[in-house]
Amino acid sequence: MSEIETVNLIICDLNWNESRKDNELFDLDVSAFLLNSNGKLSTDENFIFYNNTKSKNNAVVYTGDNLQGNKSDDEELIIINLNKIPLDVKSISIVASIHEVVGEDYYFENIKNSSLKISKSYDEFDLSGKMFLKFDLEKEFGNEKAIIALEIVRNGNEWEYIPKSKGFKNGLIDIIRYYGGNI
């Protein structure tokens, strides 16, 4: 189901408790893909994550990488100012993933109390927002390493929010390929 309305900010809030497997701490990441009319990245600069923390005009900002969870209610945030999104960006995809050691079998089921909350705010200075979607990663996506949680689609001068809940067993690398990014 989708909904259309005028909102200033979308706040993507990834949370988890410190969790271990074989004495390794889990690191989760939230990211955003700013997509063109073909549903692809027009440039790798439109992939916002821990190594590229801001879009060109600061319309999308990744606030910092928490490497182990359990520090606060807001472990990792991406803040999207919809009023600043360039016109060539037709949709924004919100992703949660496990930052993993290559070859290891770490899945969301191993990470206690992991969730992704999506909130909206009508005031660009109010980061508390009103939650309208929550994904329980541990329970809903136990056998996955990454998910596309939400797609925000431009509809004229407004935005439409479409929950996706699409899982990827091989992690973020598969999502980057899915959106045409370079690895």
Language-model features, listed with the residues they occupy:
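Intrinsic-disorder/low-complexity signal
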Residues: 1-183
